[in-house]
Amino acid sequence: MTNMRKTHPLFKIINHSFIDLPAPSNISSWWNFGSLLGICLMVQIITGLFLAMHYTSDTLTAFSSVTHICRDVNYGWLIRYMHANGASMFFICLFLHVGRGLYYGSYTFMETWNIGVLLLFAVMATAFMGYVLPWGQMSFWGATVITNLLSAIPYIGTTLVEWIWGGFSVDKATLTRFFAFHFILPFIIAALAIVHLLFLHETGSNNPTGLNSDADKIPFHPYYTIKDILGILIMFLLLMTLVLFFPDMLGDPDNYMPANPLNTPPHIKPEWYFLFAYAILRSIPNKLGGVLALILSILILALMPFLHTSKQRSLMFRPITQILYWILVANLLILTWIGGQPVEHPFIIIGQLASISYFSIILILMPISGIIEDKMLKLYP
């Protein structure tokens, strides 16, 4: 009798995706992050579901319902902190996953890459709305500041902001709709992730060399299932260390104060994973310009396939672009640091220089270095 996993209509799909999938024999641990992101999403959906059972999306009770979860619900504190710090793990994996894609030229799989960029936007939107739900000071003011940015859109801006708010300020209507969106979006993300995988399996995985690996494939199971399990264990070790020993390390103390529209916190800043984009937003003195730069800082990823000038796909054998890549990584760390600093000298000028370098490296220097490397290797006639 033929193996059921190869004949059953449903098991057959799973088999071709996770068991008998032909994978390159040389993919490194940088290829673990796709599966880690899947696990992160599952953890977030499960913990989120249990939190939603006890949470109330009303301005009067939201803050105290989160307190109730932490104090009175069995292991509520664990679920809450796993969800909050799970978001941080999600973004760490996301940034490493995108960074891997940039380094090894995975963006040449256009469909997979574009769905990935869409996923990044969806996850960022979900995380932003989730941060509003506990209705602390930073929740309220973060929501006010970020939604207010839409008022920079000419002509329709103000109307659009009031439409999103459901009134003339961030209030009960805003919180209720943010909860609804925060609940539904992860399921949309899960659906998009399946499409992401679908497109990936049309072409097969990339590998560190960027060369065609059809001549040397191995089955996904057991080789990469075991490798992924190791990655998952390491990730859970990091997550649970964070949750059980340093649950508030990545949070903001201001969010332990209930939202008060009459009192502005001294420094309004988002969660750490948005700080690089926030720094770019703040470094431009013009409101609309800042908003455009903010959106472009992520949307620039969609341009990567068109900015690829080299005859080689990966950066493995391209030392000049490698140097630029690591400068870009350092630059993003500087932007993340600046995003959390007050708007005063010398942070303003550092932020502006880092923002200029961010766009310059991606749009100008990397394409030029690709051409230079090809010339040096005499890949052009």
Swiss-Prot record:
Pfam families: Cytochrom_B_C (PF00032), Cytochrome_B (PF00033). Keywords: Electron transport, Heme, Iron, Membrane, Metal-binding, Mitochondrion, Mitochondrion inner membrane, Respiratory chain, Transmembrane, Transmembrane helix, Transport, Ubiquinone. It is found in: Mitochondrion inner membrane. Gene3D superfamilies: Cytochrome Bc1 Complex, Chain C. It is a multi-pass membrane protein. SUPFAM superfamilies: a domain/subunit of cytochrome bc1 complex (Ubiquinol-cytochrome c reductase), Transmembrane di-heme cytochromes. Heme b b562 binds at H83, H182. A ubiquinone binds at H201. InterPro entries: Cyt_b/b6_C (IPR005798), Cyt_b/b6_C_sf (IPR036150), Cyt_b/b6_N (IPR005797), Cytb/b6-like_sf (IPR027387), Cytochrome_b (IPR030689), Cytochrome_b_C_euk/bac (IPR048260), Cytochrome_b_N_euk/bac (IPR048259), Di-haem_cyt_TM (IPR016174). CDD domains: cytochrome_b_C (cd00290), Cytochrome_b_N (cd00284). Binds 2 heme b groups non-covalently. The chain crosses the membrane at residues 33-53, 77-98, 113-133, 178-198, 226-246, 288-308, 320-340, 347-367. GO terms for molecular function: metal ion binding; ubiquinol-cytochrome-c reductase activity. Belongs to the cytochrome b family. Component of the ubiquinol-cytochrome c reductase complex (complex III or cytochrome b-c1 complex) that is part of the mitochondrial respiratory chain. The b-c1 complex mediates electron transfer from ubiquinol to cytochrome c. Contributes to the generation of a proton gradient across the mitochondrial membrane that is then used for ATP synthesis. This is Cytochrome b. It comes from Mus macedonicus.
